[in-house]
Curated annotation (Swiss-Prot):
Its cofactor is Mg(2+). InterPro entries: Pribosyltran_N, PRibTrfase_dom, PRTase-like, Rib-P_diPkinase, Rib-P_diPkinase_arc. ATP binds at residues 34-36, 91-92. D-ribose 5-phosphate binds at residues 187, 211, 215-219. It is found in: Cytoplasm. Binds 2 Mg(2+) ions per subunit. Involved in the biosynthesis of the central metabolite phospho-alpha-D-ribosyl-1-pyrophosphate (PRPP) via the transfer of pyrophosphoryl group from ATP to 1-hydroxyl of ribose-5-phosphate (Rib-5-P). Mg(2+) 2 binds at residue 162. NCBIfam families: PRK00934.1, ribP_PPkin. It comes from Pyrococcus horikoshii (strain ATCC 700860 / DSM 12428 / JCM 9974 / NBRC 100139 / OT-3). GO terms for molecular function: ATP binding; kinase activity; magnesium ion binding; ribose phosphate diphosphokinase activity. This is Ribose-phosphate pyrophosphokinase. The gene is prs. Its EC number is 2.7.6.1. It catalyses: D-ribose 5-phosphate + ATP = 5-phospho-alpha-D-ribose 1-diphosphate + AMP + H(+).
Length: 287
């Protein structure tokens, strides 16, 4: 059976590339004058894959996703798969103060009302996928990240900014056949944290720092400064999601030799496409 996609407003930047490998279902998505969303499905079928990234405006993209799901069910589609390159609220995964919700749990339950399968990219806490009532898969785009940097690293190494991100660095390094490690963080004072790369010599080498999300970029800037002080030749920074605060792209770019993120969120440094990973993981089609 030919695979059919619906592209939400938050994934329009992926539509052209996806259309080279699969059919895009005809839809009409627009806004009423009062700001409410209007969705109409113009074709019928049985199985469909909806692609919707939920970056800012997060709530608008999420509500649109639900309305798309309802419209597809109304049009007779029986099996709905959802690909969410960037899942909003994924960092709100625990209660830190009494009276707070676990916001990502609420989002997962809401999506589960319409969608049978959920595919997300490099979610902040993979355990939160258990909140989704159906099949849920976390995809880490290690292959496309590795291929992008293959010719830039040579005899380099891959570093995680902390122990929690080590698995990401390991996956990329293993594809490239390179050494990997992480930074150890030690709090010296309430305002100062010491960062040290563990058990590696960076002098004269190109280094790639890998993380899931860049927001303010402060950690990456500090890590790059330390690596340069230790004699690193070039420092590259990559993340799956570029959730950049104002001015962060410029600040990080000044501190490193290259900054790149995937296109789960469209930014001016979204240089690495996740569409090949969608095709591999969801469609099992080489692209």
């Amino acid at each position: 059976m030919n695979k059919v996609f619906v592209i939400g407003s938050g994934a329009k930047h992926l539509e052209e590339e996806i259309s080279k490998n699969a059919k895009i279902l005809k839809t009409e998505i627009k806004k009423f004058p009062d700001g409410e969303k209007y969705v109409r499905i113009l074709e019928h079928g049985e199985e469909v894959i909806v692609v919707q990234s939920t970056y800012r405006p997060q709530d608008e993209h999420l509500i649109e996703t639900i309305i798309i799901g309802d419209a597809l069910k109304e049009a007779g589609f029986e099996k709905l798969k959802l690909v969410v390159p960037y899942l909003a609220y994924s960092r709100q995964d625990r209660v830190t103060k009494e009276g707070e919700p676990i916001s990502v749990r609420a989002i997962m339950k809401m999506l589960g009302l319409y969608y049978d399968e959920l595919y997300v990219f490099d979610i902040h806490n993979p355990k939160t996928l258990d909140f989704f009532p159906g099949k849920a898969v976390n995809i880490y785009p290690a292959k496309v990240i590795a291929e992008y940097f293959r010719d830039k690293l040579e005899n380099g190494l891959v570093l995680a900014p902390d122990r929690g991100a080590l698995e990401r660095a390991k996956e990329v390094a293993n594809i490239l056949g390179l050494e990997y490690s992480h930074f150890e963080k030690e709090r010296i004072s309430p305002t100062e944290v010491k960062m040290t790369p563990v058990d590696v010599n960076v002098k004269g080498r190109n280094v790639l720092i890998v993380d899931d999300i860049i927001s303010t970029g402060g950690t990456m800037i500090r890590a790059a400064e330390i690596l340069k002080d230790l004699g690193a030749e070039k420092v590259f920074v990559v993340a799956t999601h570029g959730v950049f605060a104002e001015g962060a792209i410029e600040r990080v770019s000044k501190a490193v030799d290259e900054l790149a993120v995937t296109n789960t969120i469209p930014t001016k440094v979204s240089k690495i496409s996740i569409v090949p990973e969608i095709m591999r993981s969801i469609l099992e089609v080489k692209s």
